[in-house]
Amino acid sequence: MADIAVSTRGLVKIYSNTVKALDGVSINVNRGEIFAVLGPNGAGKTTLMRILTTQLRPTSGEAYVLGYNVVSDGDKVRRFIGYVPQEFSVWTDLSGYENLLIYAKIYGVPRHEINERINEVLRFMDLSDASKRLVRTYSGGMIRRLEIATALLIEPEILFLDEPTIGLDPAARKMVWDKLTALNKELGLTIFFNSHYMDEVEMYADRLVILNKGKVVVEGAADELKRSVGGEVVELTVDDVSKTVHRVNEMNSLGIRDVNIDNDRGIVRVIVDNAEEALPVIITTLRDAGVRIIKASISRPTLDDVFLKYAGGKISEEGRLQEVRTLRSVIKKG
C-alpha cells in the first residue's frame, strides 16, 4: 500500500434509502499520478470525492487515503489532503491575500509560517500582483487559481479537485492546468480530479476511471482505453441520421465495428478497420440513397467512443456548464 495514494473497495453510497449514488466502486490511485474520474452529471463523481475527502460516510465498503481509513481515521486524512470544490469557495468582498489569511487560520497553519505560506502559494499561482485586489475584480481563471491556492496552504500530499476548470474559457483552463501539472512534476503532488472535459482528461491524466450510474465502467490510461475501442473513425454530419445508420449497417464488407450517433447534432460516427478505404464507399452509398452529407472527417477513437462502447451513452453537460457559469458570475458580482 506504500505506493497507493487512494484505494476504495466495493464503495456504496445510498441516499434516502433509495438513490444509489455509488454502486460497488473499487479503484486504486498511485502516488504521484494525475488521476481523473470521468462521467456525466449524476454518475457519482462528486459523491466519490466527498467520501474520499471525509465529507460523507459511505453506506458500505471501504475507502483509504494514504493508507488511512476515511471513516475511522478522518482527522489524519484531512492533514494530508487539499480540496477544491466545484462550488464557489472564496469571498469576493475580500482581497486575495485576506482570503488566504482566513483559510490559513482555519487550517491551523502555525502563526509564524502564515505570511510565508501565503506568499509562496500566491507566487506559485501567479497571483502576487493581484493579492491586494478585491476578488470581485478577478477573472474566472484567477478566482479558480486562488481557490486552488487555498488548498495548497497546508502543503498537501494529495489535491482533490471537483471539476477544476468548469465554466472557464480555454485560455483560463490551460493556465490552471499549467499550474496543476507543475505542482505534480515539481512537488510530486498526487492530483485526483473529476471532469467531463474529454480533452482535459486525455491531455493531463495519467490514468482515469469512467463512472456511469454509480458504477465503474472501465479504468486505465487514456491511450490504452482508446486502443481497446479499435479501428478508426469516420465521422459524418448528415441531414438524416436514421437513414444513414440504416445504410451503413448494410455495408458488411467495410469491416464496420460499431456505429455511434449524436442525434442532436446530426452526427454519425462509424468505427471501421480502415477509414481511408471506407470513407469513399460510405459517401457514394449515402449520396445514392439521397442523404445530404454536410461534413465528413477521419479520426482516431476518442474517450467519447470509449464511453459509448463501455457505457452505451455519451458524456454531455452543456446545461450544467451554463448553470455553473451563471452561478459563479452572480456570486462574483456579489
Residue ranges and their predicted role:
Residues 13, 27, 236-238, 270-272, ...:
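Preference for bulky hydrophobic residues occupying beta-strand positions
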Residues 62, 134, 233, 260, ...:
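Residues at or immediately flanking beta-strands
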Residues 31, 129, 240, 272-274, ...:
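Non-catalytic surface loops within mature trypsin-like serine protease
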Residues 178-273:
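ABC transporter nucleotide-binding domain
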Residues 4-6, 13-212, 217-218:
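ABC transporter nucleotide-binding domains
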